[in-house]
């Protein structure tokens, strides 16, 4: 139950620490996050704040969305996300969320959507071994047995098989804030994170 912020993934680079060790980092652009709704147990059944991000002209939004934003006194945004908080009364409608929420060395949690790979087989999706490639074998990339015959007479749910790979919600926990550039609104986090460039990442302060 902690506040956070949304940002656009710019890409990866590296920085050097005091010992000269190269550390891989992901750069995230934080820009234009505002509180568009405050939810409480009395009105919505749970405590949370809704954060609008991704600026967009009001004239380009639907009429219901324009009304929702005008009620909160915020400008045009195209995307929304929520953070569950303990005391929603600590926040105000239209309040801007900036990099002041974070400090260097702080641990954060990052959530994003992984790159979609489409339909993939067992070798690519689950790292299965191949079958024999020579000596007359035709079982190169086949899945093999997926269950017994009349008992149980079905394929168990969750069986690892070919299917859609990627485009899934992925959360990376306990990553470190290494650098903050407030003039450019850029946050540098240690390591790599799901998605490609321009993907939206949700960065949450550790409880």
Where are these regions (language model features)?
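Extended basic (Lys/Arg/His-rich) segments that typically form rRNA-contacting surfaces
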Residues: 1-207
């Amino acid at each position: 139950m902690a506040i956070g912020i949304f940002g656009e993934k710019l890409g990866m680079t590296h920085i050097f620490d005091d010992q000269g060790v190269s550390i891989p980092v992901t750069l995230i652009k934080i820009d234009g996050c505002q509180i568009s709704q405050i939810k409480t147990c009395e009105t919505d059944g749970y405590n949370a704040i809704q954060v609008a991000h991704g600026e967009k002209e009001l004239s380009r939004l639907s009429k219901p969305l324009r009304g929702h934003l005008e009620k909160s006194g915020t400008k045009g945004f195209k995307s929304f996300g929520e953070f569950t908080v303990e005391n929603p009364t600590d926040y105000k409608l239209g309040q801007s969320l900036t990099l002041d929420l974070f400090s260097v060395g702080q641990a954060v949690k990052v959530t994003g959507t992984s790159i979609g790979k489409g339909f993939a087989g067992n070798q690519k999706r689950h790292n299965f071994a191949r079958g024999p490639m020579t000596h007359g074998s035709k079982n190169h990339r086949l899945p093999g047995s997926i269950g017994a015959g009349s008992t149980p007479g079905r394929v168990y749910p969750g069986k690892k098989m070919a299917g859609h790979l990627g485009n899934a919600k992925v959360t990376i926990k306990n990553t470190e804030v290494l650098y903050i550039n407030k003039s450019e609104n850029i946050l540098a986090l240690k390591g790599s994170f799901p998605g490609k460039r321009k993907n939206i990442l949700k960065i949450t302060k550790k409880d």
